[in-house]
């Protein structure tokens, strides 16, 4: 058994857990980390990057189980404890998920073939950072204080923003949080709605990718590496979710804008100056 490989899986799980729900592109950081460590083969890294996100999204389900269960019951029965509009959150999440499902299933292969490039990733990191600065410096009147207050029209618009996350370097969390802030959703509600919106998208993508490409996992050690990364991402994401909600309840997202821009500039320098190409 390759101990170094298992340690690398732990590091990759930590990277995923920290970055998944921050508006900074977790996929970009995972691929950069894999490249720096020489982690696994290209085909296995591609699968790992998608499936390890399942651990992070399980942290959301675990931490918000009561609210998610109430939202599901509200959607199915029209009754939910503590909700004035029981079906609102469930319907809003469904509406917000539809655009990315349509665009993703239609153009996913083309996007990966033509846009999976370090220059594209760097540019989208920088643009995303600038957009965070823009929405933070031009706050809109708050129309939704909690995730349960997000209306169907607002949810659809957030869902359209989520489609931008199909472009490498954009960040699903970044696109949905920026979109929500732009539309007048509070910082806390923007973050939590983004958490919830990731459940169908990430679970669906992880299961689909695992079913399609499970043949690249050729040994029990491969499955162990994937399992370790997923478990570690769950534990780390659980902590980071709570820290992020506490952070945005008191502060803004500008620190993440700076992080995106700095990372984007470094990737541009690596690509233009040293011919860096992303392994994914």
Swiss-Prot record:
User: Where is it mostly found?
Assistant: membrane
Its membrane topology is listed as: Multi-pass membrane protein
Q: Which residues cross the membrane?
A: 3-23, 45-65, 88-108, 115-135, 150-170, 191-211, 225-245, 255-275
Q: Where in the cell is it found?
A: Cell inner membrane
- Keywords from the named record: Antibiotic resistance, Cell inner membrane, Cell membrane, Cell shape, Cell wall biogenesis/degradation, Hydrolase, Membrane, Peptidoglycan synthesis, Transmembrane, Transmembrane helix
Tell me one GO molecular function of this protein.
Answer: undecaprenyl-diphosphatase activity
Catalysis: reaction(s): di-trans,octa-cis-undecaprenyl diphosphate + H2O = di-trans,octa-cis-undecaprenyl phosphate + phosphate + H(+)
The cross-references to InterPro entries, in alphabetical order and at most eight, read: UppP
Instruction: Report the EC code(s) recorded for this entry.
Output: 3.6.1.27
Q: What else is known?
A: Bacitracin is thought to be involved in the inhibition of peptidoglycan synthesis by sequestering undecaprenyl diphosphate, thereby reducing the pool of lipid carrier available.
Provide the family line. Answer: Belongs to the UppP family.
- What is the annotated role of this protein in its UniProt record? Catalyzes the dephosphorylation of undecaprenyl diphosphate (UPP). Confers resistance to bacitracin.
> Could you tell me what this protein is called?
Undecaprenyl-diphosphatase
